[in-house]
């Protein structure tokens, strides 16, 4: 069967830059699934994405589906006909579904009986007949949060569509997609190359777009060009460009023909904290800041134009004029804010609502101040500095700088606190209180900063759960999942001695009578343990390993971490599987028993050699492992417990647990209970698969 290249390009208005990659990747994935579902053989599916187009190119696409043999078994003969030999309703319904009458059906005879059978040779449809519908289906499934209409059409898409091109080799595939008829015409760059031109063959794409339209359709090529040229431009002025992945992706999504240029701003603006300048350059203007070898911001920036100009200096001057007022605003705000102390903003926090039922930001500040001090006392941080940081934690939200440049919250608090002469760890804590902001983000460095970060997040968790506004599905408006994981990461990775139970109780206590959910403490702790499960699964720990530990409900995160790692190591031991199975057997035996167990194993009642041996091992191990458990050394404890495999196997091979003699039976059950208790000091390994 002949195979050809298939091309589809959707020409649009400017697509959302932050969604461009995900739209293109989803388009490719959806279309690949359509091809596979239709049994159309194909090679690689490549995607292309630029500001005004989404495209796919499929290599070696079959011209048609393969022919296939279809067999559908119907009702058994006994149910297919009545006593008079007339077809039953079941038989007629089945035949109708197959497009035949009952008397046209074949018979399938096996040693198990006889059934009606429909057998047919189905000729494969041509790709030409299928492709337009498959493209439409693929586009309809794109992850578009908000659709729009244009003109007088009812068609909806992420942006208005102007052209649709579908080619199978040199053949134009007819069809209407998103209200536009398929044609050979594609559009080039707005200001360079040919405005419109036709494509004769799918294999010409994307080269023809490059040559005639001055559009680089390959997303990764544009991104690599920008990265390479920006690095070169920065090194030319003796610096290094801040090419963050997210901004690099966004800029690559904004241009069809990237031209990297270097500009500068007045050195006087460097007196403003670099974070504010960078926020303006990256967030507002999509510029790449440049730093020197020591990491100090230079009075230069790199930007990407979407046109190759005969007079690039004019474009450079234009961008310098655009950014200057924004930098001047930052300078003005910085100087104005410093005319009063950070602490002077406290009264204004009373005018801003944190949450209707939970009070103002000033109320939140008071709670954070108290909780940060409590946490500091638990982890050995400077309590006075932690409470001071708590008091100042939200003051920068009232400054001109943060009001205008919202992403500078925290970092501006740090700069203003330093200006006011606050202790350095207090100032740094104001910046680090929001860390970690995202997966993989850095944690607060000092214990004072950890105290504040934990207090801020726990106050939010306790408050929102306390009024019953739990995260539901994908909706998490207060970012409680991120807050919970942040607290857990800080405690685990900093190895802090904090208990989630008492921490949550303290956070709830500070709300007084504001909270209406009586189960708030338990629900917050369970929610955080659930975050543990998700986190450790991502880290590669087996689900049943995590469940084994969660069965013990350890509320100290550092302790939870040690237990999970211990069980993960235990599973590598040769004895692990047998001991897990034995624990499961013990658990089942104890669950079914109605006997009241003894407080201890009575040596005088032990009869069999195997039970005496097991009891002796347990006594020795119990005493030996006590300091291991006390120190949280669970890994070595489980290694020691692995030595129980032979005596446990011998016990089950040679001892009848449910003996008729009640004293013997209860003593043996007690022995098994003590065995299980020893393992439960670490985890419930009976749940291991």
Swiss-Prot record:
Disulfide bonds: none annotated. It is found in: Cytoplasm. InterPro entries: DALR_anticod-bd, Gly-tRNA-synth_bsu, Gly-tRNA-synth_heterodimer. It catalyses: tRNA(Gly) + glycine + ATP = glycyl-tRNA(Gly) + AMP + diphosphate. Keywords: Aminoacyl-tRNA synthetase, ATP-binding, Cytoplasm, Ligase, Nucleotide-binding, Protein biosynthesis. One of its GO terms (biological process) is arginyl-tRNA aminoacylation. Its EC number is 6.1.1.14. SUPFAM superfamilies: HD-domain/PDEase-like. The keyword tRNA processing does not apply. One of its GO terms (molecular function) is glycine-tRNA ligase activity. GO terms for cellular component: cytosol. It holds the Pfam family DALR_1. Tetramer of two alpha and two beta subunits. Belongs to the class-II aminoacyl-tRNA synthetase family. PANTHER family: GLYCINE--TRNA LIGASE, CHLOROPLASTIC_MITOCHONDRIAL 2, GLYCYL-TRNA SYNTHETASE. This is Glycine--tRNA ligase beta subunit.
């Amino acid at each position: 069967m002949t195979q050809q290249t298939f091309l589809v390009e959707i020409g649009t208005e400017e697509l959302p830059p932050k969604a461009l990659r995900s739209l293109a990747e989803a388009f490719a994935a959806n279309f690949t699934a359509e091809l596979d579902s239709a049994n159309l053989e194909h090679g690689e599916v490549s995607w292309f994405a630029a500001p005004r187009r989404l495209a796919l190119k499929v290599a070696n696409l079959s011209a048609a589906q393969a022919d296939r043999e279809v067999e559908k078994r119907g009702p058994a003969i006994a149910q297919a006909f009545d006593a008079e030999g007339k077809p039953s309703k079941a038989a007629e319904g089945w035949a109708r579904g197959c497009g035949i009458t009952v008397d046209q059906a074949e018979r399938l005879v096996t040693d198990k009986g006889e059934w009606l059978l429909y057998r047919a040779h189905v000729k494969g449809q041509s790709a030409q007949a299928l492709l337009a519908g498959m493209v439409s289906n693929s586009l309809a499934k794109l992850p578009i949060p908000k659709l729009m209409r244009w003109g007088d059409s009812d068609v909806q898409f992420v942006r208005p569509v102007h052209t649709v091109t579908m080619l199978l080799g040199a053949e134009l595939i007819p069809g209407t997609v998103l209200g536009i008829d398929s044609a050979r015409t594609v559009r080039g760059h707005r200001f360079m190359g040919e405005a419109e031109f036709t494509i004769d063959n799918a294999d010409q794409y994307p080269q023809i777009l490059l040559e005639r339209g001055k559009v680089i359709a390959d997303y990764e090529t544009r991104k690599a060009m920008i990265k390479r040229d920006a690095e070169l431009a920065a090194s030319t002025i003796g610096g290094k460009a801040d090419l963050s992945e997210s901004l690099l992706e966004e800029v690559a999504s904004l241009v069809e023909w990237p031209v990297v240029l270097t500009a500068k701003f007045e050195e006087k603006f460097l007196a403003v904290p670099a974070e504010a300048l960078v926020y303006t350059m990256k967030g507002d203007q999509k510029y790449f800041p440049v730093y020197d070898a020591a990491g100090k911001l230079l009075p230069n920036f790199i930007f990407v134009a979407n046109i190759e100009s005969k007079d690039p200096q004019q474009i450079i001057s234009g961008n310098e004029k655009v950014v200057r007022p924004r930098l001047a605003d930052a300078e003005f705000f910085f100087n104005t804010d410093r005319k009063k102390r950070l602490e002077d903003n406290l009264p204004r926090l009373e005018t801003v609502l944190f949450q209707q039922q939970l009070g103002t930001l000033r109320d939140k500040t008071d709670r954070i101040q108290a909780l940060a001090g409590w946490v500091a006392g638990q982890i050995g941080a400077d309590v006075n500095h932690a409470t001071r940081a708590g008091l100042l934690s939200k003051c920068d939200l009232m400054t001109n700088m943060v009001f205008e440049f919202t992403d500078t919250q925290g970092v501006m608090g740090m700069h203003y606190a330093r200006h006011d002469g606050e202790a350095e760890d207090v100032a740094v804590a104001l910046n680090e209180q929001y860390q970690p902001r995202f997966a993989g983000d850095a944690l607060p460095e000092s214990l004072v900063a950890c105290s504040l970060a934990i207090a801020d997040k726990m106050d939010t968790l306790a408050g929102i759960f306390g009024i019953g506004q739990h995260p539901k599905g994908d909706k998490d408006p207060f970012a409680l999942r991120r807050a919970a994981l942040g607290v857990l990461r800080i405690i685990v990775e900093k190895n802090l001695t904090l208990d989630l139970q008492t921490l949550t109780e303290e956070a709830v206590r500070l709300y007084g009578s504001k909270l209406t959910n009586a189960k708030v403490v338990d629900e917050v702790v369970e929610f955080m343990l659930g975050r543990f499960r998700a986190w450790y699964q991502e880290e590669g720990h087996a689900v049943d390993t995590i469940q084994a530990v969660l069965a013990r409900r350890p509320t100290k995160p550092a302790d939870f971490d040690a237990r999970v790692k211990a069980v993960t190591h235990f599973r590598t031991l040769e004895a692990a599987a047998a001991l897990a199975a034995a624990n499961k057997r013990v658990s089942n035996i104890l669950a079914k028993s109605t006997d009241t167990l003894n407080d201890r194993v009575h040596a005088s009642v032990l009869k069999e050699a195997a039970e005496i041996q097991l009891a002796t091992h347990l006594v020795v191990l119990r005493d030996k492992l006590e300091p291991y458990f006390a120190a949280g050394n669970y890994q070595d404890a489980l290694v020691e417990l692995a030595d129980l495999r032979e005596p446990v196997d011998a016990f089950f091979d040679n001892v009848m647990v449910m003996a008729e003699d009640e004293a013997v039976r209860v003593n043996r059950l007690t022995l098994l209970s003590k065995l299980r208790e020893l393992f439960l000091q670490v985890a419930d390994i009976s749940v291991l698969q």
